């Protein structure tokens, strides 16, 4: 894995506008950063990214299978007891999964380490699957990277294939909250993939969802919604006043309810419990287990429900705070994880996001930040394969 500087396309702003990339600049700061690129070899991708992703995903599914049968685990995950049975039903029925993203730290000379798995509401999808590929095509044409360079990126192909597998005569709704450019772009991109698969689809904001007679979900025209993709956390749905309606299983939500186990950072200590010493895992503990942290060991404290680095704190071996990100999750239960430093290139720390569609590892996106904690504003940097 090497990083090097490359020229920025002179008409980047226009290209972004033409492709609906409305957030390539966030708060007057660069988000999409194509002034540099990461180069990987095919062997690195296949052996160090793709293979571990596939193996870890299967391990995660084993955790789900154990968790739905174990009330102690569900309690540790802070999932409300009201939903235990319906989550187990969702898993036994093998309700559909669409996609997820594993976040890795990789220094290049040791196995990747899994930091967390967002299997419910992962973003940076549009950038990884679509806009990054446009950059690759332009970069090859202009000669700034080898003309035979490739990219670890079959995400869009797999998404379209997955929507073909999920095809139904009923409209597939796609929804997110209002006033979120990134979420809307992600959802519209997924809707486009569904349409390419031949699926009738409709967009609606979460705020515009209604309830009909008997508690059925409806759109603005009072049509009953039977299937919907939502870029809205499952734990928020469970805490909503209408959350108990999930137990009736009237609608098919994507992501499915069983994925609430995988999008929970409590997954990390469970993986360590069931697969201790695995080379791609970091030692991790629940709140009641933190006495197992070795004296002098640096560690990270994370809320079990947290997004975009919110309320993550890094401690050194003397329990001094090394870095902290503010957020809205300070009251959540915490997990503790052995600290794995991100590789540093210049002034930037680099995180690899490895994408999974259904059960298949299929692509990658790279984020950079000037701090050790990756956040929603962390820069997205393209990659390519050569050699």
Q: Language-model features: where?
A:
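Preference for protein termini
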Residues: 1-387
């Amino acid at each position: 894995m090497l990083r090097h500087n490359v020229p920025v396309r002179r008409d980047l702003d226009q290209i972004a506008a033409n492709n609906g990339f409305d957030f390539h600049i966030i708060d007057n700061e660069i988000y999409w950063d194509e002034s540099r690129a990461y180069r990987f070899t095919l062997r690195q991708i296949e052996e160090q990214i793709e293979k571990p992703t596939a193996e870890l995903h299967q391990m995660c599914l084993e955790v789900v299978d154990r968790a739905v049968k174990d009330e102690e685990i569900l309690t540790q995950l802070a999932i409300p007891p009201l939903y235990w049975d319906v989550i187990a039903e969702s898993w036994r029925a093998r309700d559909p999964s669409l996609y997820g993203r594993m976040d890795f730290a990789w220094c290049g000379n040791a196995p990747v380490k899994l930091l967390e798995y967002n299997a419910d509401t992962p973003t940076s999808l549009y950038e990884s699957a679509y806009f990054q590929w446009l950059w690759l095509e332009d970069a090859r044409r202009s000669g700034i990277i080898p003309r035979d360079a490739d990219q670890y990126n079959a995400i869009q192909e797999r998404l379209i294939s997955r929507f073909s597998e999920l095809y139904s005569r009923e409209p597939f709704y796609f929804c997110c909250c209002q006033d979120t450019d990134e979420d809307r772009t992600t959802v519209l991109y997924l809707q486009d993939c569904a349409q390419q698969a031949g699926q009738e689809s409709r967009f609606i904001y979460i705020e515009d969802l209604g309830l009909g007679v008997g508690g059925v979900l409806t759109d603005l025209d009072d049509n009953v919604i039977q299937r919907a993709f939502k870029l809205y956390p499952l734990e928020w749905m469970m805490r909503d006043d209408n959350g108990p309606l999930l137990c009736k299983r009237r609608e098919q939500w994507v992501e499915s309810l069983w994925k609430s186990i995988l999008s929970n950072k409590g997954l990390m200590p469970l993986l360590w419990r069931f697969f201790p010493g695995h080379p791609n895992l970091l030692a991790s503990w629940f709140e009641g287990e933190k006495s197992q942290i070795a004296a002098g060991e640096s560690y990270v404290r994370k809320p079990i429900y947290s997004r975009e680095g919110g309320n993550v704190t890094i401690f050194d071996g003397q329990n001094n705070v090394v870095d902290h990100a503010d957020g809205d999750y300070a009251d959540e239960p915490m997990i503790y994880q052995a600290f794995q430093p991100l590789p540093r290139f210049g002034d930037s720390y680099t995180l690899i996001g490895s994408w999974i569609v259904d059960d298949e590892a299929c692509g990658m996106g790279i984020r950079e930040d000037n701090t050790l904690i990756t956040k929603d504003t962390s820069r997205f940097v393209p990659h390519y394969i050569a050699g």
